[in-house]
């Protein structure tokens, strides 16, 4: 229906010989302002040098009559408000029943090639709650963007080079020796996690004392430990519903000479200089807002983290992606400007790299702050979250707020089986519909694809129809703005609309035509609830 309104306005402007206008049509929060509203008249004020209300009148007078539109009004400074006939709203049910799993698909991405990189935690320990939020939010965004016509690839960058891996090797060797009963002390800056103890024991069980005789012990442990940690990370992410297209190794950048090539590219572009024995990138001259230049090669010849990151982003862009979308932790806020500067320095555009910064998560239980796992006495991990509340609840609660908002996650609320739990409220709507449909099937045969939409004109049916019709636009906006939390907001609204409909209408009655129409409506609601839940990686149970 929204597309039809846009087309009506577009045709009217054509009659007025006005073109090149980006027509915006929104859904007013207040139904007194119609079902759809456009500010196109106000957009044209400067161009036409007329009062926007006068422009609005001219546009309306040139809009062709349409059987779906009841009336058009001008409001405020020049908003054009469209009121749709109640009887025409029902057509969305037929579309949903026909589209089924495809309902909500759109082409706002127009095939744009996007590389979404997310989580990318160091392979030196278990994933924590911050990684869990990044995982849930980013995976949901990937699903939404794929549904919206983007050619999207999901990538995990394995930080398997650098000093953190040297520390991992030292930590693993100490734990291995301790498992053998040897006297070995863990350095203060080593990794003290339980997973490293398990790794040490695993090395002892698999190899006994034989590894101590190897001349290449460090290199062997490096490969083994990284593989072990990545196996654990992949297991946790898989149990959380994540899939990746590519796992990219930082180490491969060095092995394939890509770091040297990136440095060569920066030198050719003329944005590097030497000072105090170090090689610097002139990020302040590249217009991305970085407040000081950055070191690439230190005076001692070692490379900074930025250097390999530059090589990695050059590799991404050289692979032909139109947009690189990095999802980073809150501690990376100041890092984005220098990354963008490096992209520009290599001859690409700054807007080919965008970053989402995920803010912190605070865990609560009945409003009380929780810092440690009762089971382990350690910081709470992604695995702890899954074990505590389940993957569905963990994902839903971690996606509910925008990336730039701090998030409070209350375990008690997530486990509650009442309307106070937003996920339970949504899933219960789906389960209730499934129950009604099973009940109807036991009583008679109904053909939901052959119903009378004219019977869906009561207040609660109309509200539900409007909510169903909004869904494709919600998906498109969530994709365009990188905001998967919009899907959670929509699910709350749709579930509320259904529950109100159910509480005020008897679905199965002796009037078969009315029953059939109501069953078609709630089947459309069921499909939409399922599709929206799937976009955030959450199940739609048939029974609860």
Regions of interest found by a model, annotated:
Residues 2-90, 101-544:
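Non-catalytic interaction-recognition regions
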């Amino acid at each position: 229906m929204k597309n039809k309104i846009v087309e009506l306005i577009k045709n009217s402007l054509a009659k007025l010989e006005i073109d090149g206008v980006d027509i915006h049509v929104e859904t007013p929060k207040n139904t007194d302002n119609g079902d759809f509203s456009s500010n196109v008249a106000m957009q044209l004020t400067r161009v036409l040098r007329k009062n926007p209300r006068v422009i609005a009148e001219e546009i309306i007078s040139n809009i062709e009559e349409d059987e779906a539109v009841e009336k058009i009004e001008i409001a405020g400074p020049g908003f054009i408000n469209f009121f749709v006939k109640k009887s025409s709203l029902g057509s969305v049910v037929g579309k949903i029943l026909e589209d089924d799993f495809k309902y909500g698909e759109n082409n706002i991405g127009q095939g744009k090639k996007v590389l979404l990189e997310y989580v990318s935690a160091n392979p030196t320990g278990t994933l924590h709650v911050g990684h869990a939020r990044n995982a849930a939010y980013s995976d949901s965004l990937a699903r939404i963007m794929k549904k919206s016509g983007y050619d999207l690839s999901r990538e995990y960058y394995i930080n398997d080079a650098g000093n953190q891996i040297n520390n991992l090797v030292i930590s693993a060797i100490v734990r291995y020796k301790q498992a053998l009963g040897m006297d070995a002390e863990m350095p203060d800056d080593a990794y003290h996690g339980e997973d490293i103890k398990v790794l040490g024991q695993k090395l002892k069980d698999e190899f006994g004392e034989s590894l101590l005789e190897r001349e290449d012990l460090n290199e062997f442990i490096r490969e083994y430990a990284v593989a072990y940690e990545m196996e654990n990370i992949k297991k946790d992410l898989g149990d959380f519903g994540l899939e990746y297209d590519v796992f990219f190794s930082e180490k491969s950048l060095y092995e394939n000479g890509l770091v040297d090539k990136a440095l060569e590219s920066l030198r050719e572009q003329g944005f590097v200089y030497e000072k105090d024995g170090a090689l610097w990138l002139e990020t302040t001259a590249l217009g991305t807002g970085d407040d000081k230049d950055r070191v690439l090669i230190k005076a001692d010849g070692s490379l900074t983290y930025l250097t390999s990151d530059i090589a990695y982003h050059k590799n991404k862009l050289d692979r032909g992606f139109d947009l690189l979308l990095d999802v980073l932790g809150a501690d990376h806020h100041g890092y984005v400007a220098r990354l963008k500067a490096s992209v520009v320095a290599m001859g690409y555009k700054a807007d080919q790299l965008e970053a989402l910064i995920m803010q912190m998560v605070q865990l609560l239980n009945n409003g009380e702050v929780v810092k440690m796992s009762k089971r382990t006495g350690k910081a709470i991990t992604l695995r702890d979250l899954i074990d505590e509340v389940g993957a569905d609840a963990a994902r839903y609660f971690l996606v509910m707020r925008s990336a730039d908002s701090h998030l409070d996650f209350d375990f008690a609320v997530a486990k509650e089986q009442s309307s106070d739990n937003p996920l339970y409220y949504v899933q219960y709507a789906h389960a209730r519909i499934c129950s009604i449909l099973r009940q109807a099937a036991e009583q008679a045969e109904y053909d939901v694809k052959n119903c009378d939409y004219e019977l869906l004109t009561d207040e609660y049916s109309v509200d539900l129809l409007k909510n169903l019709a909004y869904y494709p636009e919600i998906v498109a906006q969530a994709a365009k703005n990188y905001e998967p939390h919009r899907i959670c907001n929509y699910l709350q609204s749709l579930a509320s609309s259904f529950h109100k409909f159910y509480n005020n209408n008897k679905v199965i009655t002796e009037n078969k035509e009315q029953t059939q129409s109501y069953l078609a409506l709630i089947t459309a609601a069921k499909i939409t609830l399922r599709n929206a839940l799937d976009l955030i990686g959450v199940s739609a149970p048939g029974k609860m």
